């Protein structure tokens, strides 16, 4: 799938081009596209002509006026489905689903907050992501903006492996960068919601009750008395069920077993 096919499948403006792509598993393809009409304008704070703009803010800004002129001059008769009439040339993360016959079907697109500007001096890789490309940094910024909650991506996987969410994304020994990057962007720390029992405990197959992970005993390491906490709870539940059942229930079970044995014996004689 080429860059032009990716843009056409997502119904974007022809000015969009493929910047980076990454394959996730066997059934997902994630691509990063940006518009070639986006220009970066540098505002000199020492000059007298400041175009009536606030010079105390960032010196770099996105010049959408020149982009709009180019759009109206060259693509005046084309249909616009990406919302470019509102001078919005934001970048998108496109997600594709694998289909039969080695094809990819467009699934959805995620709009980024700021347009992506290609930095030629750093030699960004346009053919694919090698772990240091633009798509990697963009996805990392998106993960930084998310608070650490049980509902964030890979949260359950991190708890199963016994590590924290920030360690999964930033590596061991770099957990402090999570809070520092959030503070630089002015993001507030969202309080954690009440965790469900499925995140911190497991459910017994026989008893159906929730049990804390640290209280579960390893089935291979058997204690002296009994075979672990799980089997002990199973015996307790079985005794409780016997107390709740009427007395004639046991006799009914014996009759059922006898009928089953007679049926099996008759089947054997018929086969013989």
Swiss-Prot record:
Q: Where is the composition biased (Low complexity)?
A: 72-84
Leader sequence segment: none
Origin: domain of life: Bacteria
Stretches assigned to coiled coil: none
Composition-biased stretches (Polar residues) = 173-187
| Region ranges (Disordered) | 65-84, 171-196
Family membership noted in the UniProt record? Belongs to the MgpC family.
What is the protein name stated in its UniProt record? Putative MgpC-like protein MPN_366
The scientific name of the source species is: Mycoplasma pneumoniae (strain ATCC 29342 / M129 / Subtype 1)
Q: What is the lineage of its organism?
A: Bacteria, Bacillati, Mycoplasmatota, Mycoplasmoidales, Mycoplasmoidaceae
